Amino acid sequence: MLAATSIIAEAERTVGIADSDACVRGNLERLVDSLNREFPMSPKGEMMVRSTLLMDSVNRLQGLKWLQDHPEIAAEPIEDPVFLMGLPRSGTTYFQYLFDRDRRFRLIRTWESSMPSPPPGSDPESVTRRRAAWIELQKARGHFEGFEALHLYDDDGSDECHAFLEQSYGAAGLHNLYRVPTYFDWLMDELDLVQTYRIHKRQLQLLQWRSERKPWALKYPNHVIGLNEILEVHPDARFVMTHRDPAQVLASISKMTHNLRSRRCAGPVDMHEVGRDMLHFIQRHVDRIMTFDRGPFGHRVIHIDYYALIADPVREMRMMHRGLGIDTPDDVGEAVSAWCAANPKNARGRNDYSLAQYGLDAASVAERFTAYMRRFDVPPEREGLARAGTLPSGPVHAGNPGSNDPVSAP
């Protein structure tokens, strides 16, 4: 059985300071309770989960220690950050990799997300060591079969914000890694996301300290659940949101979730249970998107059509840049074009899945998300791919076997 108290205590001993983030212990207790009751872990799986949760607290406390020793870090400005988001599997990672071609922005690197200390600006020589250590760690861990087709990832590429949000145990994506439905609903309804994003900001300040200041581009699909909280922490935040057929999103996130949970679960993962969990998961994300859109700050979101993005990435980047009030230099457009040419669709394998595999009915799913699709002019997958000129030869509806993602990994 996992125990929140022992995890925090071990992290405190490892770093040598007391945990002063008052909100975090309660978040971890809720998560651990849900894990112990709702997610039967194999012995190896439980070790993996505990190791990850411990690393989260160690990384957070190391950041706190740096702040204690160098209080000027708290004054480090995080100016005009761009938050990249959208429903999970709606092209956010693809868009992040395009964004990474623009050197005017700072993105989190893969090794930084899991090994953020010491701050790179304070110990530049450690960067090379940590990069190499991260690559070796990934080789040792391995990925599930088909991972590269399902998720775009490079060992030395840009990374999302999950690890920084997980430092406070406030990351919605934990429900994809582990089955924790009670924790997920508590996160959505009660967890203090303002504190979660303050800890997230603190980590950005640490990475930026004594380094060149650039606007941050911060990708995490699940940022959509905390837009108001992000604005409380970052009043000058800018938002970019991708949109894709929710039926396709749902089938794809179900496959990803099934594979991730299977690595830690004691027995076979019930695919229909995954489908039910993810239907609720996506519904709650859509509800947050729609609620924010109707609110006073809905106009601050730049909306990106997934199908337009894969049809003409440079055009969509130019449109997005106009929304941000900046130009698109020729070298950025050329870099985006070159990256797309080097990473053609299905280059890392096909990604096959269907709603039916997860016990979901395509017609009822489509009906459930009609209002969202109408509001953001999101076409059904087949229509969108046809419009983009990327329609494969086989069936391409999430309700039928043989569906695939037209880019390597959204």
What are these regions (language model features)?
Residues 114-216:
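PAPS-dependent sulfation machinery
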Residues 101-111:
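Post-Walker A helix-loop "phosphate-sensing" segment adjacent to the P-loop in P-loop NTPases
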Residues 85-87, 217-221, 306:
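Short His-Asn-centered micro-motif
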Residues 84-101:
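Glycine-rich phosphate-binding P-loop
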Residues 1-65, 72, 181-197, 204-211, ...:
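PAPS-dependent sulfotransferases, especially Golgi type II membrane carbohydrate sulfotransferases
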Residues 73-79:
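Phosphate-binding P-loop
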Residues 115, 223-229, 247-250, 310-313:
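Flexible loop/turn segments at secondary-structure boundaries
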Residues 219, 230-255:
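Conserved phosphate-donor/acceptor-positioning beta-strand/loop module used by diverse small-molecule
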